[in-house]
Amino acid sequence: MVARRVGIVRYDVYASASCSVRDAKMLPWVTYDEAMAHLPQARWITATAVRDHQRIAAVRLNDAEALLEAVIAGLGRSLLPCVVADGDSRLRRIGGKRRGSVLSRELWLLTHSELRRLGRIEAAAKWIEQIAPH
């Protein structure tokens, strides 16, 4: 396997656009279930909720898309990738005082060493590198 870093995925706190920022900050945290608790974004949510004595919603999900839809539906707030959430008018960013992100993760592309020189693999890798957030 050949690995190369292709970008950075930044995360911030979002809630449904139908909620005011003030109300959204009172919503419980929607997070991942125990099978996904190892993810940095899940650990950040848990640590923040514990530190600030905030509630975690009864619903816990094992899929990032389901987490996004739960936030859009108004079930709570969550940490979402900015590259996805900023482009969705159904969401409102309610993160911290600064306009940046609260968590960043490196995005890596893994390619089988014997296949990486195939035209279709090279084309796909080049496309991923072009669209990956930096």
Annotate each language-model stretch with its function:
Residues 110:
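Short hydrophobic/aromatic beta-strand micro-patches
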Residues 1-107, 133-134:
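C-terminal regulatory
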Residues 116-130:
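Short amphipathic alpha-helical coupling segments at ligand-binding clamshell hinges
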